């Protein structure tokens, strides 16, 4: 999915009960990409009673989340509540005023409910679970905002259109806004998920006008193997107490991938990995940054970036870096440069030697040629000049 700003919808109770001292106001932030999005209330002035739920990745590839604030019922209609949404990747800022449109309070009015009733979300298995045979991949179906009046939820699961019955439904959990959250988990086979089988969760509840169906599967398309590069700390960062080791993973498809760090065989936990970002060629890339104490880096500890993806051989690869490896690389580069200079000087020396030999040879040949010509001229003069002394004697 390309960068997309969110749509923002205010959520408010449609009635007020005299038995309820508080009311819940909500803000639905829908259909945005990529993460993250920031939600505040009254420009950050209202923080008490605020709860923002984690973002949910929809089957469309876009994210949605909701934020709820609990306020005194008596303040509805007299105070203003505004939901402030900021999505920096798309440079989108939205301010939505949440207003409760209710009639006179009456004892028989039900407790405030969210508009639309229960919502259903379907989550894929974690990439690491689908790529390691020792782990168990699961597809998870989550139903939220289930009312106390109709708490029973029925789940039906289908794999490629065929109903299956091995899913497990967890006990419902009561939420802070007096609704229930119900979760059903379906265990799937590794190869079924990787081969693109389609999983459907069908949810039925009396609070719904009709059943809700959600479908999910692995992204279609030819898998592409990721390229992994590790980057040491910059020289500027070496002045600080902690340094950053970076792992660049690029060129992979689909976006399902797992990245972890370890050192000397032990896992490292102080790292952050960006969500996969769609590149111009249709593949994805991401960065993972591990933060370590500078002393550990200077001691020569080896740190490894481990990548798991379906297009890799055995679904796994690892790239390591350490100060000693970087020094060896620098020494190798220096030796290569020295070797290149040595070769250059050798070439120059040979050229100069050959040039001097050529000059000497040419000078020697020229010298002998000049000497020969000079000797020939002298001999010729001696032969041609007449002997005037004999001629005078003969005349006398």
Swiss-Prot record:
Keywords: Adaptive immunity, Cell membrane, Disulfide bond, Glycoprotein, Immunity, Immunoglobulin, Immunoglobulin domain, Membrane, Secreted, Transmembrane, Transmembrane helix. Residues 99-110 are annotated as: Hinge. Glycosylation on Asn-177 is required for interaction with Fc receptors and ability to activate the complement pathway. (Microbial infection) Deglycosylation on Asn-177 by S.pyogenes EndoS or Endos2 endoglucosidases prevents interaction between immunoglobulin-gamma (IgG) and Fc receptors, impairing ability to activate the complement pathway. Glycans are attached at residue 177. The chain crosses the membrane at residues 348-368. PROSITE patterns: IG_LIKE (PS50835), IG_MHC (PS00290). SMART domains: IGc1. Disulfide bonds join 27-83, 141-201, 247-305. Residues 6-99, 118-217, 226-322 form the Ig-like domain. SUPFAM superfamilies: Immunoglobulin. GO terms for cellular component: blood microparticle; extracellular exosome; extracellular region; extracellular space; IgG immunoglobulin complex; immunoglobulin complex, circulating; plasma membrane. Residues 369-396 are cytoplasmic. Residues 1-347 are extracellular. GO terms for biological process: adaptive immune response; antibacterial humoral response; B cell receptor signaling pathway; complement activation, classical pathway. Immunoglobulins are composed of two identical heavy chains and two identical light chains; disulfide-linked. Constant region of immunoglobulin heavy chains. Immunoglobulins, also known as antibodies, are membrane-bound or secreted glycoproteins produced by B lymphocytes. In the recognition phase of humoral immunity, the membrane-bound immunoglobulins serve as receptors which, upon binding of a specific antigen, trigger the clonal expansion and differentiation of B lymphocytes into immunoglobulins-secreting plasma cells. Secreted immunoglobulins mediate the effector phase of humoral immunity, which results in the elimination of bound antigens. This is Immunoglobulin heavy constant gamma 4. It comes from Homo sapiens. The lineage of its organism: Eukaryota, Metazoa, Chordata, Craniata, Vertebrata.
């Amino acid at each position: 999915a390309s960068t997309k700003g969110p749509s923002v919808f205010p959520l408010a109770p449609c009635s007020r009960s005299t038995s309820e001292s508080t009311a819940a106001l909500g803000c639905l932030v829908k259909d945005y990409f990529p993460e993250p999005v920031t939600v505040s209330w009254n420009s950050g002035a209202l923080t008490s009673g605020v709860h923002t739920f984690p973002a949910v990745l929809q089957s469309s590839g876009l994210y949605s989340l909701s934020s709820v604030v609990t306020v005194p019922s008596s303040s509805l209609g007299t105070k203003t509540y505004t939901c402030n949404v900021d999505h920096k990747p798309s440079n989108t800022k939205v301010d939505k005023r949440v207003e409760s449109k209710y009639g006179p309070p009456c004892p028989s009015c039900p407790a405030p409910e969210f508009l639309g009733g229960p919502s259903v979300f379907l989550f894929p298995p974690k990439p690491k679970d689908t790529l390691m045979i020792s782990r168990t991949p699961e597809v998870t179906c989550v139903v939220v905002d289930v009312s106390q009046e109709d708490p029973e939820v029925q789940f039906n699961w289908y794999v490629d259109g065929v109903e299956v019955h091995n899913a497990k439904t967890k006990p419902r959990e009561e939420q802070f806004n007096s609704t229930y959250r119900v979760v059903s988990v379906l265990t799937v086979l590794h190869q079924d998920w990787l081969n693109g089988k389609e999983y459907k969760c069908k949810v039925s509840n009396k609070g719904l006008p009709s059943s809700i169906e959600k479908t999910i599967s692995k992204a279609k398309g030819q898998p592409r193997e990721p390229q992994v590069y590790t980057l040491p700390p910059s020289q500027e960062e070496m002045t600080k107490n902690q340094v950053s080791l970076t792992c660049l993973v690029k060129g992979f498809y689909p976006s399902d991938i797992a990245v972890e760090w370890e050192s000397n065989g032990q896992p490292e936990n102080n790292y952050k990995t960006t969500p996969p970002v769609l590149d111009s060629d249709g593949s994805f890339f991401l960065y993972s940054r591990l933060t370590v104490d500078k002393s550990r880096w200077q001691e020569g500890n080896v740190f490894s970036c481990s990548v798991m993806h379906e297009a890799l051989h055995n679904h796994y690869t690892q790239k390591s870096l350490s100060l000693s490896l970087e020094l060896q690389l620098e020494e190798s580069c220096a030796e290569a440069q020295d070797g290149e200079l040595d070769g250059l000087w050798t070439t120059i020396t040979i050229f100069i030697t050959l040039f001097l030999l050529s000059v000497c040879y040419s000078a020697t040949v020229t010298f002998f040629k000049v000497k020969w010509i000079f000797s020939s001229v002298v001999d010729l003069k001696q032969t041609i000049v007449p002997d005037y002394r004999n001629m005078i004697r003969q005349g006398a």
